[in-house]
Design a protein with these regions (language model features):
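N-terminal ligand-binding/catalytic initiation module
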Residues: 2-162
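A glycine-rich, Thr/Ser-enriched phosphate-binding loop motif common to dinucleotide/cofactor-binding enzymes
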Residues: 165-180
Length: 180
């Protein structure tokens, strides 16, 4: 049983049921294009998809025009510093990362996908994110223990050409500044 503040009015069962009701979890992927005809399907995948593929191969910035990249954020954690719960592992952080993804969608209409990296080695986490970074318009680092979180953020800022937001650092700074 988790400790709750006086403003939390739910039971552990209600919290679990919320995450399990209907489809499990809090996020899903849906098409932004109509896929009702055979023509739609051939444009969405093969052979029609070859045209934007060729455009992006000639000009990588075209990915912002022909794919979801510009409105897609990766919410990434290794679960080493989950909220006030501590190091419970990558998989245990998934409900938090899904929760952050739905906040992006609900309040900014930004599509976000959770990625949990089952690794505590900062160099390996950096390499993993560098390898997938081009798929996203931004990276949101979440619930990664210090000092690794600072090392990871700094290295990614230096090597990726997309925004890197370290939620636990930047989010706290923004809220603190707003309060002042």
């Amino acid at each position: 049983m988790t400790k709750k503040s006086k403003i939390d009015h739910y039971t552990d069962k209600e919290a679990l049921d919320f995450h399990n009701k209907g489809k499990s979890g809090k996020i899903e992927i849906i098409s932004s294009k109509s896929l009702t005809t055979k023509r739609d399907l051939s444009l969405a995948y093969s052979p029609g998809v070859a045209v934007p593929v060729m455009e992006i191969s000639k000009n990588p910035d075209a990915a912002y025009e022909y794919t979801s990249k510009g409105n897609l954020v990766a919410v990434i954690s290794n679960g080493s510093a989950i909220l006030g719960l501590g190091d419970l592992g990558a998989l245990a952080s998934k409900p938090v990362m899904e929760g952050k993804a739905v906040l992006f969608k609900r309040f900014a209409d930004i599509d976000a996908i959770d990625i949990e990296i089952d690794n505590k080695n900062s160099d390996e986490i950096i390499k993993c994110i560098q390898n997938i970074g081009n798929s996203f318009g931004g990276i949101n680092l979440e619930d990664i223990a210090a000092p690794d979180c600072f090392i990871i953020e700094r290295k990614l800022r230096d090597t990726l050409d997309i925004p890197i937001f370290h939620d636990d650092q930047h989010g706290t700074a923004i809220i603190t500044s707003a309060a002042l």
